[in-house]
Swiss-Prot record:
Belongs to the universal ribosomal protein uS8 family. GO terms for cellular component: ribonucleoprotein complex; ribosome. Pfam families: Ribosomal_S8 (PF00410). The keyword rRNA-binding applies. One of the primary rRNA binding proteins, it binds directly to 16S rRNA central domain where it helps coordinate assembly of the platform of the 30S subunit. GO terms for biological process: translation. The gene is rpsH. This is Small ribosomal subunit protein uS8. Part of the 30S ribosomal subunit. Contacts proteins S5 and S12. Keywords: Ribonucleoprotein, Ribosomal protein, RNA-binding, rRNA-binding. PANTHER family: 40S RIBOSOMAL PROTEIN S15A. One of its GO terms (molecular function) is rRNA binding.
Length: 133
């Protein structure tokens, strides 16, 4: 079955694994999924990223983070914003603050994929891929 939106697929896999308290989850590897995973790691939502497989069948293995004695997921929610049928672009001043700054937005800019905080610091806007909190 063809996957028409690999970013939504990645977010859904991470969300489902996080809800079920899995230690790791596998995501098909691409430049975009690597970039999103790297941003999630830099912001503290994922502890480790590794790759397995070769060529077309390469997967990213993401080690999820949990907090506290009862292992509460660090990722509470992931929401896709810009979709293949309706792209959402924002300039620097219009970049959203997710939950008043407690969450983050992942933005695809001309300087690469980055968090909303980094995009504001660098003064660039772009496509709002998703919200994470």
């Amino acid at each position: 079955m063809a996957n028409h939106d690999p970013i939504s697929d990645m977010l859904t896999r991470i969300r489902n694994a996080s809800e079920k308290r899995h230690q790791t989850t596998r995501v098909p590897a691409s430049r975009m999924s690597r970039s999103i995973a790297k941003v999630l790691q830099q912001e503290g939502f994922i502890s480790e990223i590794s790759e397995e497989g070769e060529g077309v069948r390469t997967h990213l293995v993401l080690e999820l983070k949990y907090s506290g004695k009862h292992r509460h997921p660090t990722i509470r929610s992931m929401q896709r914003v810009s979709k293949p049928g309706l792209r959402i672009y924002k300039n620097t001043r219009a970049l959203p603050k997710v939950l008043g700054g407690l969450g983050m937005a992942i933005i695809s800019t001309s300087k690469g994929v980055m968090s909303d905080r980094d995009a504001r610091k660098q003064g660039v806007g772009g496509e709002v891929l998703c919200y994470v909190y």
